[in-house]
Amino acid sequence: MGAVKNEDISYRGRRGPDRKDRSYARRSYARKIHCRTLSDGCDLLQPGAWDERIYRLLQWKERDTETGRKLAGGVRWEAGMQITDCSAYEILQKERIEDVHADGYLLRHKKSGARVMLLANQDENKVFNIIFRTPPADSTGVAHILEHSVLCGSREFPLKDPFVELVKGSLNTFLNAMTYPDKTMYPVASCNDQDFKNLMHVYMDAVFYPNIYEKEEIFRQEGWHYQLEQVDDPLKYNGVVYNEMKGAFSSSEEVLEREIFNVLFPDTPYGVESGGDPKCIPDLTYENFLAFHGKYYHPSNSYIFLYGNMDMAERLEWMDKEYLSKFDKITVDSQIAKQKPFEKTVEHKIFYPVGENDSEEENTYLTYSMVVGDGLDVKRCTAFEVLDYVLLSAPGAPLRQALLDAGIGKDVDGGYNDGIYQPFFTVEVKSAEEKDKEKFLQVIRETLEKLVKEGIDQKAIAAGINYLEFRFRESDYGSYPRGLMYSIDVCESWLYDDNKPFVHLEKLKAFDELKKEAGEGLFEQLIQETMLDNPHSAVVLGMPKKGLTTEEEKKTEEKLAAYKASLSREQLEKLVEKTRKLKEFQDSEDSAEAKAKIPMLKRSDIGKEALKIHNTPHHVTGNTVLHHNLDTNGITYLTLLFDTKQVQDELISYMGILKSVLGYVDTAHFTYGELFHEINAQSGGIGCGLQVFQGKDQKNDCIRMFGVKTKYLVQKEEFVFSMIREILFTSRLDDDKRLYEILSQQKARLQSSLAAAGHSTAVMRAASYYSPVSNFQDRIAGIGYFRLVEELEKHFEEKKEILKENLKKLMLLIFRPENLFVSVTTDE
């Protein structure tokens, strides 16, 4: 194909109840198929012929149909690892963690008190993560600013930005740092042994010996400073984190989520903004900044995580010799306190900014949130993930559908929010009105009471459990290293209870117990206890307000002007001088001597043998099947790619709607809710999406593909093909009510997502005028697409027939055998 660029655009695979991507699966099927819905007599679209054709495409080799094959998650590790020679550490716990196929160790460094977790297996993508509990006392953003600042040079690597140089000679697979509401982490990953050691060295030096004590300019650059280039200029605030958080506070969803935290947990670190509130960031002093590091960035407050195939004993010895042995154990008061339960539900309003051209009508967020326990009980946590699926996330979910049917807002979101000491569950409606608040709460209560009284659909529960178990066993995190995600998972218990470090890696028992107890009223009891009879809850409304940004900026300008007026000429000149010195610091070049200290990989450190990827093309019935032979732990990954070159220009944006409709409307034999549950109950999901490839002619050519992706165990292959056929050939595209619901949801989500990623949206739009790839992206996922969705939703009654006709045209143009390219990945 000559493809040099692959853009996977809004692929809606059913990856489950993640807060940013909800999608799931479907129901049992009958063999009797009537496909006149779309084919109108076209032989190419007869599903019977398609069944035979698809089967033939995938029968080009012998297949292992062993029904007893077990889906294994993670990387297998058969041999036990022995940690016997590390006298500097006390081994507190050792166990075989079968759920993730690893040997787990929990250690404590004797001299410094550092906690250390080892997960040893054969994964060559090694991960190191050092985590500190960093509970903020206010919203000055000190934890966030410190996360930026420690990476601006250290004792052994005194560059202004050592990581710019480091990545030039690194093969890292992950290199970053993250601030959470109660912790800060510094993870790295690499498949190369020497590279991994280099990364560990730079990160350990950064967190324990940063240059922040010698160079105040780092704090001023990364946090905040007064900017005054000339005495007569207006005084301004500036700083990396300050500007970053100004952007974050302009996002409606971030403003709302932040307020929910603040209202639910007013007496804990979750009640303030760890990232920093722009109004509060300038209150942070350099002295308090340094004190925060001195208090929390000590080995006694650290949680060190090592994962993968490495010489663990050697790494432990290195950490002891180079860093941990330099510190004595101290007591660090960083324990996260629990919020005292409320006696009654609290209510609060928060305003978020909208543009002058945006409407304040039908733009309110209604939310109801409940604290549902703590994160230490893995079975309970998993049960709430299932309830997320059952109540809200799955299409047709009863609480979601009840709110939509009541005409409250245009989209429903929310779900289970974990990753903190006290997880909570939120029901959120977008594009609503303030006057709908009481109706919103009434519908929630009536729907939940009905579910408790009549019982939850057991098929929905089974689908939710199977989906979550499939995802856990598969442990596929896309481009993120598996060990990185495990290091985040263990923090959900380890940081709050030293005796429960591995509980979120051992979930299979919880899944088994939930399957057994699902029919005994477990989930109904949880709803009654935590959602109906729980006073520790909050109703938070997010209200749009025009001119809010201008209003806030004016207040800031007036505050700065008043402060400037209070300064003497001499003080103003000092500010000018500090501004000049900061710019001089930023513009100065690191010395060659300093750059030379950054560890770089040598050729001898890199193996000569590249990782062999076996891609074997097969030509069957006139189509190409590309087989990838990889270790998939018994899972088949199948992608059907349909070339869309026959699609006329005026229909391109409608492809974005089509991929949002397929699988989310009724078919010949199922409601969309039934389909969704059945697919999740028996596979890893089916999803539709659009991909674009840069062609050989880099300037004027691109290849556009409509994809159908799925993953399943081999014994479920026939079922999966039947479900794909059900979706592609019997989808009901004439259900006006459902089409309008989907358009409304699309509009609400696009309004939030495009605004939240404004820079990316603008870049895509600008590039669309000269790049075919960007033009396609914009028309199916950007501003061009939003304009179509907005127009169709606004004038639905007038344009619904055009919409339905165009969707049917696309079905006929795209899903033709001659357009098909198959990619299949198996370990056989």
Predicted regions and their residues:
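Low-complexity, intrinsically disordered tandem-repeat tracts enriched in small/polar residues
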Residues: 16-18, 23-25, 30, 35, ...
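Intrinsic-disorder-associated, low-complexity terminal segments enriched in Asp/Asn/His/Tyr and depleted
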Residues: 8-11, 18-21, 34, 43, ...
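Intrinsic disorder/low-complexity segments enriched in small, polar and charged residues
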Residues: 3, 12-16, 36, 51, ...
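His/Glu-rich zincin catalytic helix
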Residues: 74-163, 187-194, 201-204, 250, ...
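M16 family metallopeptidases and their MPP-like homologs
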Residues: 125-135, 161-209, 216-227, 254-279, ...
